[in-house]
Amino acid sequence: MKYTIISGPTAVGKTDLIIEISTKIGAQIISLDSRQIYKLMDIGTAKPTKEEQQKVKHHLIDHIYPDEYYNAFYFRQDALKLRKQLTKKGIIPLFVGGTGLYIDALVKGFFEGAPKDENIRKHLNKLEKKEPGTLRTMLQKYDPEYALKIHPSDMKRTIRALEVFFKTGKKISELQSQTKISNKYKIIVLTRNRQELYERINTRVEKMIKAGLIDEVEKLLELYPKDINAFQTIGYKELIHYFENKYDLKTAIHLIKRNTRHFARRQLIWLRRYKNAIWINLSEISRRETIEKIEKIINEV
């Protein structure tokens, strides 16, 4: 059996399409969104509404609290467990979302790399103990791409990446990128013409503000410190800076729109790496044709 991943840039219009398709075929959704995973962060992450979630069961949405640590490795474990449970019940799991690291975790897994070297590990631990932050700086120097992927305080993965580098002379990010994509998955990428996508992003940000995003951020700041990883999410970090009087509300909204457009562009660049992905331009075909095309791909053996 082949499983279907449906991805695309933020604001492309995945949610309502997938709700309709899932309702028709009796599927359940496993989210591929690293921000919708947080509880209490609803408006700024564009979570499916309660009504939409009642129509179709969603998994890995509202999964953890904003101050809890989670990464792509944990996601893969949770997603594979859910996939197995749903398949066993005869339910089609649809993987839906635009977080590239989660898609990679699902279709590639994780590079195991060179065997452990206790001498290197002891030396690295000694360096970190002597001067905290040293290993993070080393990783940023030797493998900046991987440093961006992991949490700054994830010492286990930092040490592993440096260990692989010193053992093999190769970056763990490069070795991971060479990992073959599993043939168990079909990837569909939804896209739109650039100007239309950017207009949709701008409109959605305006709707988020009207829906109460400012109040949502204010309430979250009463519960959690401003520097947690979850608050690096676009829409939250800009409004936190607004509350700190770094700029006015008009500037904050402008930055949310701009940063979201930049994010959408990065998502599209990432998705182009999947050479066998099937691209569907929603600007060029009707909704009915889109639904029929996606259903056909899902049903193909």
UniProtKB/Swiss-Prot annotation:
Q: What is its EC number?
A: 2.5.1.75
Q: Which cofactor does it need?
A: Mg(2+)
* TM region(s), chain numbering: none
From the UniProt entry, list the residue stretches annotated as the region Interaction with substrate tRNA.
Answer: 33-36
Could you say which residues bind substrate here? 10-15
The Gene Ontology biological process terms listed for this entry are: tRNA modification
Question: Which residues are listed under the site Interaction with substrate tRNA?
Answer: 99
The Swiss-Prot or TrEMBL record describes its family as follows: Belongs to the IPP transferase family.
Its protein name is tRNA dimethylallyltransferase
